[in-house]
Amino acid sequence: MNKTSLPPIDSIDRQWYVVDAENQTLGRLATEVASILRGKNNPNFTPHLDTGDFVVVVNAEKIQVSGKKPQQKLYRRHSGRPGGMKVETFESLQERIPERIVEKAIKGMLPHNALGRQMYRKLKVYKGTEHPHSAQKPQPLQLNPSATAK
């Protein structure tokens, strides 16, 4: 009978990675980042523990989508009040708050429970190349070549 080894929470060594979103396809970038946030790249991955690493995404305003999605993909939010639904296209949201596009795509690929919320807190998304996490010495993360937009 095999026994599952549980890594102690203190022994989990979290790495910091920086990902450049320039000319990356939104969904392909989001799946790779979500996998790292979950910890699936670590040998001590455990589904019910947060074993993931920190990820800093830069150049969020340069993310790409294919086809007519810039004009047709819609982002909805609701104020909680009657008639408070706001709908915005990818293009207009990318002009206003490009970080939200990447955050929303990655958050949707994480578990929808308390553990997923804990994993989501390790994601940092910034417009432009500057970020305040240089003290953590994040390693540049090269995504799969197939994840690059053509």
Swiss-Prot record:
Family: Belongs to the universal ribosomal protein uL13 family.
Molecular function terms, GO-annotated: mRNA binding; structural constituent of ribosome
Keywords: Ribonucleoprotein, Ribosomal protein
PANTHER family per UniProt: LARGE RIBOSOMAL SUBUNIT PROTEIN UL13M (PTHR11545:SF2), RIBOSOMAL PROTEIN L13 (PTHR11545)
Role of this protein: This protein is one of the early assembly proteins of the 50S ribosomal subunit, although it is not seen to bind rRNA by itself. It is important during the early stages of 50S assembly.
Segments of skewed composition (Polar residues): 136-150
Listed InterPro entries: Ribosomal_uL13, Ribosomal_uL13_bac-type, Ribosomal_uL13_CS, Ribosomal_uL13_sf
Classification via Gene3D superfamilies: Ribosomal protein L13 (3.90.1180.10)
GO biological process annotation, one example: negative regulation of translation
Region (Disordered): 127-150
Subunit structure: Part of the 50S ribosomal subunit.
Keyword RNA-binding included in the entry's annotation: no
Protein name from the UniProt record: Large ribosomal subunit protein uL13
Record lineage: Bacteria, Bacillati, Cyanobacteriota, Cyanophyceae, Synechococcales
Residues annotated as signal peptide: none
Gene from which this protein is expressed: rplM
Keyword Ribonucleoprotein attributed: yes
GO terms for cellular component: cytosolic large ribosomal subunit
